[in-house]
Every structure is written in C-alpha cells, then in structure tokens.
Amino acid sequence: MYKRQSLNYPEDSAGRLMSVDFVSLTPNMNVGEAIDSFRISDDLPIEFYEIYLVNDSSKPIAAISLSNIIRSSRDKSLKDLESHELIMISADMDRELVAYQFERFDLVSAPVVDDKGSLIGVITADDIVEVFKDEAGEDIKLLGGVGDEDITDSVIETSSN
C-alpha cells in the first residue's frame, strides 16, 4: 500500500524532486476499507493530496483526491469515484518540463513512474515552487551577466570566463 525506497536520479530530474512517500491502493477496495487502512497504518505520509489506484503491476490507473474519498459513502468502490485525468511524470524527465506540466495541467500532485510505468513516487506543487524559484534565480543571474560563475569567484576569474 505505501512505498518507501531510496532512489538516485540526476540532479535536474523528476526522480530527484519526487517524494517516495505516497499512498497507493487497489481499485477493488471501497472507501471504508481505504479509510480504515489509513487509520491503522504506521506508514501513512504526513501530507498527501491524492490516492493513486494501481494495477497488479503497480502501474497507476487513476488518481482520487482525498476530499473526494472523505465525501463519499463507505461502501462506494474506489474505482467508481470520480478521478481527474492522470498526468504521469517519468522519473528521468527534466525538472523544468515537470514544472511546465504542473502549470499546463494545473496539477496539485502527479505520480512519478519508472521506465516500466510503475509508480515510484509523487511530486507535489510545493516541490514545483522550488523549481520556479531556482529558475528565477538563474534568470536573474543571466540578466545581470553573472552566468554560471560562482558569486565568490574573483573579478578576474569571472571576466576571463
């Protein structure tokens, strides 16, 4: 149900941005079973916005908002709950492209999948804010003519680059 694993991905990739603390359930559960499993779990993430329904191969098939689960009757099947379009992020996708996907589709969170399409993590809008901050900082440095040089570089080192 809950997955934790240590992953190493390139610095500018979605894999580096993602959290490996997420909630995934099977579509054959009902709302009551899902809520009961949350209550007894010692492994539940502190914050989460969506529950991912996965097939037997751990491939995401739907995302259901936590608010949708809370508003539904206990006997309603998870697969019958309304879910939004599932936008999946590849673990090796560049973080700037991930930020673009969040902006384009107005995402709160998105599942991250490996090269086999299996769910391995989640990226939230909070993570993307950091990407935008970093990109804005880079843009400001470029506008100021600083480029990739370290601020601690001497004037001679900077001008020779």
Residue ranges and their predicted role:
Residues 3-161:
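Cytosolic regulatory modules rich in charged/polar residues
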